[in-house]
């Protein structure tokens, strides 16, 4: 089985964190990149030949993959970034389906019987082998993973209409305003998780049909899945049936699309709750990432942290509560950090206050400065989400 990870997304809704990098390369949970979650799921599930399709500002992502995800070449295993190569003419990827069409040489080289096509910017644990087993049993051309979400959230997702058997896909709507609810749960719909398992022949044929359609948007969810649904070749995999070793009742079925600042922030708060909704510390189904060569975190006299994740290399001289700190963060004496996410090498000066904020790497907060204290001033100087999360980009100056 070949794994293809779609990692070329621009991530406009996650600005300014994506101003200098692709969305899958954004830091999450202190030490991880978003792409680490899907790659860990595939590798833990014994899918060991993986191509990561990249395009938008991919240097940070390419470097992370090549320095972190080094598999055993002696066994023919690999995780490799594959940039847009203009194999079908002088054009970049027109959409996720076109990205795979232009990269079909990867499929032809491996000649797998099945292809897993997964997104790169979600936070979750999943054993793809269970989805593959259902796909093989169903005989479908494609199986799409779905998760139940409230109907009110439908405009944010592709919505799957299941058949009476609960497995056949009878319809697909891209971000509908008011879709019908499920027969057994009218308040919910099945949202597509952006994860697909294809029989290779069905995938290749669907991509070529899509390429010949002048009205297509060349998207996996918006084009390929509806096409195969109309042909009666699509099946649904209910994510709630998936189980991984070491999971708890709290994090079983956890999946978050962190494509907006509010969702990104909320997912971090899930990590530091007293009973975390997502457990980063499951050793039976680990999330892998790059190991930094830094000394352990240090707390000086007066340095306090509670309900927080503090990464290696951090120096805490002030007060940190309900926050996630990446490696190398410094919090000086008298400084207060509350409900915030600080990326690598952020420095919070003496007496400064940071509340409800996401600070990208290398941001320097001067002594006595405040973020998250004066809403009017914050709105004039920084990016502020609909939910009130304040975000500063990489290296952004704080007056």
From Swiss-Prot:
Question: What top-level branch of life does the organism fall under?
Answer: Bacteria
* Keywords on record: ATP-binding, Carbohydrate metabolism, Glycogen biosynthesis, Glycogen metabolism, Nucleotide-binding, Nucleotidyltransferase, Transferase
Family matches, as InterPro entries: ADP-Glc_PPase, ADP_Glu_pyroP_CS, GlgC_bac, GlmU/GlgC-like_hexapep, NTP_transferase_dom, Nucleotide-diphossugar_trans, Trimer_LpxA-like_sf
Q: Can you tell me which family this protein belongs to?
A: Belongs to the bacterial/plant glucose-1-phosphate adenylyltransferase family.
Listed HAMAP family? GlgC
Q: What is the protein name for this chain?
A: Glucose-1-phosphate adenylyltransferase
* Annotated catalysed reactions: alpha-D-glucose 1-phosphate + ATP + H(+) = ADP-alpha-D-glucose + diphosphate
Subunit structure of this entry?
A: Homotetramer.
**Which PROSITE patterns does this UniProt record tie to the protein?**
ADP_GLC_PYROPHOSPH_1, ADP_GLC_PYROPHOSPH_2, ADP_GLC_PYROPHOSPH_3
The pathway to which it is assigned is: Glycan biosynthesis; glycogen biosynthesis
**What GO biological process, any one, is recorded here?**
glycogen biosynthetic process
Function comment: Involved in the biosynthesis of ADP-glucose, a building block required for the elongation reactions to produce glycogen. Catalyzes the reaction between ATP and alpha-D-glucose 1-phosphate (G1P) to produce pyrophosphate and ADP-Glc.
Q: PANTHER family under this entry?
A: GLUCOSE-1-PHOSPHATE ADENYLYLTRANSFERASE, GLUCOSE-1-PHOSPHATE ADENYLYLTRANSFERASE-RELATED
- Quote one Gene Ontology molecular function term: glucose-1-phosphate adenylyltransferase activity
**Binding positions for alpha-D-glucose 1-phosphate per the UniProt entry:** 158, 174-175, 192
E.C. code = 2.7.7.27
The encoding gene? glgC
């Amino acid at each position: 089985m070949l794994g293809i990870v779609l990692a070329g997304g621009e991530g406009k809704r996650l600005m300014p964190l994506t101003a200098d990098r692709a969305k899958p390369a954004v830091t999450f949970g202190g030490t991880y990149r978003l792409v680490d979650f899907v790659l860990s799921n595939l590798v833990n599930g014994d899918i060991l030949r993986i191509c990561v399709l990249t395009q938008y500002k991919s240097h940070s992502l390419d470097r992370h993959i090549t320095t972190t995800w080094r598999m055993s070449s002696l066994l023919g295993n690999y995780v490799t970034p594959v940039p847009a190569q203009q194999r079908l003419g002088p054009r970049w990827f027109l959409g996720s389906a076109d990205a795979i069409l232009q990269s079909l040489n990867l499929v032809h080289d491996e000649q797998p019987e099945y292809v897993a096509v997964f997104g790169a910017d979600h936070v979750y644990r999943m054993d793809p082998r269970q989805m593959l087993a259902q796909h093989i049993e169903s005989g479908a051309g494609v199986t799409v993973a779905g998760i139940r979400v409230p109907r009110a959230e439908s405009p944010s997702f592709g919505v799957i209409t299941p058949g009476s058997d609960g497995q056949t896909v009878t319809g697909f709507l891209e971000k509908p305003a008011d879709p019908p609810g499920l027969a057994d749960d009218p308040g919910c719909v099945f949202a597509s998780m952006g994860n697909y398992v294809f029989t290779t022949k069905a995938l290749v044929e669907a991509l070529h049909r899509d390429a010949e359609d002048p009205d297509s948007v060349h998207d996996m969810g918006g084009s390929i899945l509806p096409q195969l649904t109309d042909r009666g070749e699509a099946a649904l995999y209910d994510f709630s049936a998936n189980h991984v070793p070491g999971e708890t009742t709290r994090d079983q079925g956890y999946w978050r699309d962190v494509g907006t600042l509010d969702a990104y922030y909320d997912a971090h708060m899930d990590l530091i709750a007293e009973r975390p909704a997502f457990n980063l510390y499951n050793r039976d189904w680990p999330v892998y990432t790059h190991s930094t060569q830094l000394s352990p975190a240090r707390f000086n006299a007066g340095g306090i942290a509670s309900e927080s994740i503090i990464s290696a290399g951090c120096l805490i001289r002030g007060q940190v509560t309900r926050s996630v700190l990446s490696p190398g963060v410094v919090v000086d004496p008298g400084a207060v950090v509350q409900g915030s996410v600080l990326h690598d090498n952020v420095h919070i000066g003496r007496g400064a206050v940071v509340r409800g904020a996401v600070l990208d790497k290398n941001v320097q907060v001067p002594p006595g400065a405040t973020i998250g204290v004066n809403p009017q001033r914050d709105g004039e100087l920084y990016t502020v989400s609909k939910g009130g999360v304040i975000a500063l980009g990489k290296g952004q100056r704080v007056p």
